[in-house]
Amino acid sequence: MEIVIRQTPSEVSSTVADIVEGYVRRGPATLGLATGSSPLGSYRELARRHRESGLDFSDARAFLLDEYVGLPKSHDQSYFSVIRSEFVDHVNLDTDRVLSPNGESPDIAEEGARYDAAIAEAGGVDVQLLGIGTDGHIGFNEPGSALTSRTRVKTLTEQTRLDNARFFDSVDDVPHHVLTQGLGTIGEARHLVMIAFGKGKAEAIAAAAEGPLSAFCPASVMQLHRHVTVVIDEAAASKLQLADYYRYALEHKPSWQSF
């Protein structure tokens, strides 16, 4: 696991965009896209590079981490619609090459296995972007999730539904269930890139990177992965015991060694 500490959120977003751009330019790339606030700056930077420098996404494809159950794909709060408005519609990535779990599947219990099979058929994900919750969750893998879990249906906590109600007309409109890639599915991506900002994420980052491997902190499963880059700002790094070493290692990173 490589931990990259940047001074500001904008520097974090730029570094993450550099990583994604490398895969896109080497192409064809299969991207794992996350929603939420953490990757937004990186999406904006990638869109700028497409607009101003011709960064070409036409050969790329993408898989989403999760999707609401029972919400039409066309609904403005489906994660498919959200990722379109935040990123896909701003680059030349064909929406037919962007896949999400089918929250309206007539056989919702089997949809997770179908989605995992689709990822495998595409050759797997090259680079997966991830945020992290204050409790260490990634995707909708809340504390207690099996570290080898596959894409499956999860029940949203009442607090999560209340938190998400601001995006809907009322809390009654927020779905109770979501399809999410499991920790095992996420871990099959060849490169995991975690993004975090602010003191509010500092304890979660410390637990994920330096704490024990435990279902209590789902993101700690990254410790077992062969290629992880955690890109954070100084505030999110404030609880790391080895922060000085991570800064030293980055400063002396060999010129031939990429992220």
From Swiss-Prot:
GO cellular component terms attached to this protein's record: cytoplasm
InterPro entries: Glc/Gal-6P_isomerase, Glucosamine6P_isomerase, Glucosamine6P_isomerase_CS, NagB/RpiA_transferase-like
Cystines in this chain: none
Key words of the record: Carbohydrate metabolism, Hydrolase
Pathway this chain belongs to: Amino-sugar metabolism; N-acetylneuraminate degradation; D-fructose 6-phosphate from N-acetylneuraminate: step 5/5
Chemical reaction(s) catalysed: alpha-D-glucosamine 6-phosphate + H2O = beta-D-fructose 6-phosphate + NH4(+)
Active site: 66, 135, 137, 142
Biological processes per GO annotation: carbohydrate metabolic process; glucosamine catabolic process; N-acetylglucosamine catabolic process; N-acetylneuraminate catabolic process
Gene3D superfamilies: 3.40.50.1360
Alphabetized GO MF terms: glucosamine-6-phosphate deaminase activity; identical protein binding
Catalytic activity, EC: 3.5.99.6
Free-text function comment from the UniProt entry: Catalyzes the reversible isomerization-deamination of glucosamine 6-phosphate (GlcN6P) to form fructose 6-phosphate (Fru6P) and ammonium ion.
NCBIfam families assigned: nagB, PRK00443.1-4
Family: Belongs to the glucosamine/galactosamine-6-phosphate isomerase family. NagB subfamily.
Protein name: Glucosamine-6-phosphate deaminase
The species this protein was found in: Rhodococcus jostii (strain RHA1)
